[in-house]
């Protein structure tokens, strides 16, 4: 999270989602994230990682990489017995998003208008 020119945005999420973010953040503090990390910084990190991952997947798809195979491997991981339900849920959402955004790109490689106009259902 760089200190480049920054823009402030506001998002409204349910109390349940906020509590889930807090719990996930607490598990990561001290191991993968500094103890001083706030929920807002955590959300910024999640969003920036999502954008970077999306860009990489798009790049792979454009270069001829078999993104569908990658999705199948992620599904196998998510379907393993003993895998934490939260991880399964996260992988499920990741797969839905990647299917919608990358499995059926337009001829010019851009996302569908539906992807650009979608909003959070939180």
Curated annotation (Swiss-Prot):
- Name the domain of life this protein comes from: Bacteria
Annotated stretches, region: Disordered: 97-122
The protein depicted here goes by the name Uncharacterized protein MG202
Q: Which organism is it from?
A: Mycoplasma genitalium (strain ATCC 33530 / DSM 19775 / NCTC 10195 / G37) (Mycoplasmoides genitalium)
């Amino acid at each position: 999270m760089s200190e480049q020119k920054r823009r402030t945005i506001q998002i409204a999420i349910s109390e349940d989602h906020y509590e889930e973010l807090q719990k996930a953040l607490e598990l990561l503090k001290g191991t993968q994230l500094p103890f001083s990390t706030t929920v807002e910084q955590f959300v910024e990190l999640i969003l920036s990682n999502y954008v970077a991952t999306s860009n990489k997947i798009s790049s792979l798809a454009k270069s001829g990489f078999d993104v569908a195979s990658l999705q199948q491997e992620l599904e196998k991981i998510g379907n393993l017995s003993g895998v934490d339900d939260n991880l399964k849920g996260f992988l499920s959402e990741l797969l839905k998003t990647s299917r919608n955004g990358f499995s059926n790109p337009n001829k010019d490689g851009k996302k569908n208008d539906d992807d650009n106009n979608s909003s959070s259902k939180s």
